[in-house]
Amino acid sequence: MRTKQNNAGNFKKKSIYIIPERSKINKFCTELTGITPQLIEEKGIYFEEACEKIKDEYHSAQLTWAGFGNFDKEQIMEQCDYLGIENPFSENYINIMYQFKKYNGLFKMMGLKRALHFMNMDFEGNHHSGADDAYNAARILREILR
């Protein structure tokens, strides 16, 4: 689940679906994310493959990466440790939630949808879809960096 800015300043969405190894896709997961067992069966790859793909396609070890909060970063680090593989990302990480709070002089953190609303932006796509969440977080970061 990545976003990449093209030369026009627009973001391009791309999803990588991971085959779960310690759980199954259940009804709750499907309702929350839109990911179905059939989608994973058709397009899913193992976490290790996804890490290699990210390294190869994005040269991610050399780039700063970002997320809205630390949850995704921690999950990636934990899974890499669990599997004994190298994290495909650099140590340079931007916590967009924290930067948003700091930029706006807020005392409390807020979720992605509320942060967008605070900036007079609508959430685009499906909340909890990795690609859509990444896209919307990138929109916030772009506004902060202007």
Regions found by a protein language model. Give the residues of each.
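Metal-dependent phosphoesterase signature
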Residues: 31-53
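Metal-dependent phosphoesterase core characteristic of DEDDh/y 3'-5' exonuclease domains
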Residues: 2-35, 55-146
